[in-house]
UniProtKB/Swiss-Prot annotation:
This is Tetraacyldisaccharide 4'-kinase. ATP binds at residues 55-62. The gene is lpxK. NCBIfam families: lpxK (TIGR00682). It is an enzyme of class 2 (transferase). The keyword Ribosomal protein does not apply. It comes from the Bacteria. Pathway: Glycolipid biosynthesis; lipid IV(A) biosynthesis; lipid IV(A) from (3R)-3-hydroxytetradecanoyl-[acyl-carrier-protein] and UDP-N-acetyl-alpha-D-glucosamine: step 6/6.
Length: 328
């Protein structure tokens, strides 16, 4: 229902307009206060790059963060990552991730980024505290990438990157809750780069698509072509589950059942195993896998996806980030 409201297919969005006006007024006032320096943002001693969204819901932001960190690492740059840690609750903040950190403590996305990149990752509701925690333990870090936080103006940033869904784009264009917007589309004029996940990119936008890899068994780490798996049941606890289901079908899988879950939803063995009958195979996202690995069964698999970006604007962005980081 929410997708129909945000896309404009359902007229119910009109009933929510008063709340959207209030949301827009408050969010605009907050940004203006920082712009006029009525509120002061904390500036890190090294460059900060924000990778965020203008809309609620999954746009492929986390794969972009992983891709960006890996690209900078390949250029010899030491990168740190900070996040709010949605879906997690640590005993205290900031929390610097280690191999023992669970998704219950840090959230699924920070754990995934840490496992994929090996970069220092810290979470905190106050992102400046997360930056300080990284620099205290890793003073050689040259640049910080913040996963989400475009609207977290308390942390000053040097580069802003926005990821948008190239198919859904901005829906009906209204602020939450009548529409999907955290900020209006005009905000794109002030950011440094716009990455478009799928669809047809417009002039100046960086095209991106998600490339699926081989399926990975949660218990053994064995890899195989996902199309070889039979009697598949799939779950997806991401911002936009239909994208993952469509990816599986593109890979030649016809799931017997597709189960969308809430983004950042906590998972346990009883709930997940109840979704799979005898003889069926469970396939999930990598983001779900980091929550399920500790109690996974033999027939549980995940399908990793990697961001693939291209174009002249991408080369300019990487050159800009490399230059910024090299100065520190």
């Amino acid at each position: 229902m929410i997708e129909k409201i945000w896309s404009g297919e359902s007229p119910l969005w009109r009933l929510l307009l008063p709340l959207s006006w209030l949301y827009g007024l408050v969010s605009g006032a907050i940004r203006l206060c920082y712009k006029l320096k009525l509120k002061r943002a904390w500036r890190a001693p090294i460059p900060v790059v924000v990778v965020g969204n203008l809309t609620a819901g999954g746009n492929g932001k986390t794969p972009v963060v992983v891709w960006l960190v890996e690209q900078l690492q390949q250029r010899g740059i030491r990168v740190g990552v900070v996040s709010r840690g949605y879906g997690g609750k640590a005993e205290s903040y900031p929390l610097l991730l280690s191999a023992d950190t669970t998704t219950a403590q840090a959230g699924d996305e920070p754990v995934l980024i840490y496992q994929r990149t090996g970069a220092p990752v810290a979470v905190s509701p106050v992102r400046s505290d997360a930056v300080k925690a990284i620099l205290a333990q890793h003073p050689d870090v040259q640049i910080i990438v913040t996963d989400d936080g475009l609207q977290h103006y308390r942390l000053a940033r040097d580069v802003e990157i926005v990821v948008i869904d190239g198919v859904r784009r901005f829906g009906n264009g209204w602020w939450l809750p009548a529409g999907p917007m955290r900020e209006r589309a005009g905000r794109l004029k002030s950011v440094d780069a716009v990455i478009v996940n799928g669809g047809v990119p417009r002039s100046g936008e960086i095209p991106m698509h998600l490339l699926p890899g081989q399926a990975v068994n949660l218990r053994t780490g064995t890899r195989c072509d996902v199309a070889q798996l039979e009697h598949v049941v799939t779950i997806a606890g991401i911002g936009h589950p239909p994208r993952f289901f469509a990816t599986l079908k593109m890979c030649g899988v016809q799931p017997e059942k597709c189960v969308p879950l809430a983004d950042h939803q906590s998972l346990n063995h009883a709930d997940v195993s109840a979704l799979v009958s005898a003889g069926q195979t469970l396939v999930m996202t990598e983001k779900d896998a980091v929550k399920c690995r500790a109690f996974a069964e033999e027939n549980w698999w995940y399908l990793p996806v990697d961001a693939q970006l291209s174009g002249d604007e991408l080369a300019k962005l990487l050159a800009q980030l490399t230059s910024l980081a090299s100065g520190h």
